[in-house]
Regions:
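Positively charged n-region of N-terminal signal peptides that target proteins for export
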Residues: 1-5
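Bacterial N-terminal signal peptides
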Residues: 7-17
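N-terminal, motif-rich segments that launch catalysis or mediate targeting to/interaction with membranes
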Residues: 18-138, 149, 154-273, 277-327
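Functional cores that coordinate and move charged inorganic groups
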Residues: 140-144
């Protein structure tokens, strides 16, 4: 029997076109549960449906509900913040140094992740099940965003280099087409001795891929006729999506995926490791509280067999029950 969702209704979520999409975010959060050491894995596995489905809720707040404070949490335009030694240490300092418009335009992603870690650690200390699950699932989304190179760049959609559309192509369309072939098994999570440093190391590593990503796409676009880069309508014009953006052809997506040489899969795996490790770090820093009494023993026992089966699948790089429109 598959694990049952405890005390939370299932979320029915439509496809989000930006920010890894459902395909990426759900896989990252679900695999991160499998990468947790025991006993933390047991607790998270009891709620794996919620952790998985809630992975895209920050995008729903951003796009469907238009929460005005949500957008800047998803990105950090590194080039516009000056030298690294001048970065504010936390969100409070950032708000003192920069005005609201600057932060809205350029993002607060790394500081928001650190702020979320403080809240998650507190929730673990208090053994507040609802807050643990909500914060952990949300945190997984932002860590996923922190592994998308263009979420760390001012040239976030190639708009500064005549490459518009590259953002959603890289993080949504490519996973849609190819994620079912990715092997997403990673080693167990580890504890970060310095959370602040771990966050900025993650951001810097991701940002180092932004220009190579753009260069690969630029070279390939230049060498490919327009009618092969984009899908064309009956009149021979570039087909536009409902968001009025050009629709890339599957053939171009395949070529770009090949040229990127595993970058998308690699970043997803890094995101899985980081998500599990930040969850684990918050739990350890909270004193490793015993969470076994937050769920009924009967539910944990019932889920034990499914956990073993899913663990065996995960060791092979597979995740149970993950589908998308191309499967």
């Amino acid at each position: 029997m598959r694990p049952k969702l405890i005390a939370f209704g299932a979320l029915i979520i439509g496809f989000i076109t930006l920010s890894w999409g459902i395909v990426g975010h759900e896989r990252i959060n679900k695999a991160a549960v499998m990468a947790l050491p025991h006993p933390l894995q047991t607790f998270f596995y009891n709620h794996i449906d919620f952790i998985t489905q809630e992975a895209s809720v920050p995008d729903i707040r951003k796009y469907a509900l238009s929460y005005k404070d949500e957008g800047p949490r998803h990105y950090f335009d590194m080039e516009n913040f000056g030298s690294a030694d001048s970065y504010p240490k936390n969100l409070e300092e950032a708000k003192k140094k920069y005005d609201a418009k600057f932060l809205s335009d350029n993002g607060i992603l790394p500081w928001y992740i650190e702020d979320m870690m403080v809240k998650l650690t507190k929730a673990f200390k208090e053994k507040n099940r609802a807050e643990i699950l909500f914060l952990a699932a949300d945190l997984g989304h932002y860590i996923g965003d922190a592994h998308m190179p263009l979420h760390t760049s001012a040239n976030h959609d190639g708009q500064l280099s005549e490459q518009k559309g590259i953002h959603s192509l890289w993080e949504s369309r490519l996973p849609e087409l190819f994620a079912k072939n990715y092997k997403l098994n990673v080693p167990y999570a580890h504890h970060y001795e310095d959370v602040h440093k771990a966050i900025w190391d993650m951001i810097n590593d991701t940002h180092s891929l932004a220009q190579p990503l753009l260069d690969i796409d630029k070279k390939l676009r230049t060498a490919t006729p327009e009618n092969q880069v984009f899908k064309m309508d009956a009149e021979g014009k570039v087909l536009k999506s409902k968001y009025n953006t050009a629709v890339f052809s599957d053939e171009y997506a395949k070529k770009l995926h090949e040229q990127l040489n595993g970058m998308v899969e690699s970043q997803m795996k890094k995101a899985i490791t980081a998500t599990a490790s930040f969850w684990y770090t918050a739990w350890v820093d909270a004193g490793k509280p015993d969470l076994s009494d937050l769920d009924s023993p009967e539910v944990t026992k019932r889920n034990a067999k499914a956990l073993k089966e899913d663990w065996d699948l995960f060791q092979k790089g597979d995740l149970f029950g993950m589908r998308n429109q191309n499967d």
